[in-house]
Amino acid sequence: MSDNANAIDPNETTATRRQRGERIAAELSGDPNPALLATLDRDFPFLANALTSYAVGEVLARTVLDVRARQLALVAAFAALGFGNEFKIHGGYALNAGVTEDELKEIVYLITIPAGFPRAIQASQALAELLASRRAA
């Protein structure tokens, strides 16, 4: 499959991508107005626009991978990079998309190979926080 099979129309406006990004963010989070985007929009509108129009409205809008696979890939990447906050955000999205707690724990185990134990321990702590907050809700 070529990269162009899933490409976003280059003539599409940033506003169109942002609208799509806002819709996808709401679907992923299960919240029609995700708090992260609202805070960014208020305090750092340029970041909110970049995140919503490009990262979500373009990259996450692609359909070569389904939502579940895409979120597993992102969770693994964020865990390996040591980005605990992003791991928790996308871990929540992954759970919303049908990924199980055991699958997220397996990601933590798997990243010991490319990223080492310190990053896996960071990810395990982030996952424990995520799961505790979801159970408390």
Language-model features, listed with the residues they occupy:
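Acidic, glycine/proline-rich low-complexity segments that act as flexible tails and inter-domain linkers
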Residues: M1-V67, N96, I121-A137
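A general alpha-helix detector
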Residues: I24, A55, L72, I89-H90, ...
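Short acidic alpha-helix initiation/capping motifs at coil-to-helix transition points
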Residues: N49-T52, L81-K88
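Short, structured motif recognition centered on aromatic/hydrophobic residues
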Residues: R70-F78, I107-I111
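Substrate/cofactor-recognition hotspot
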Residues: Q71, E86, L110, F117-I121
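A short structural micro-motif
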Residues: A79-A80, A97, L110-F117
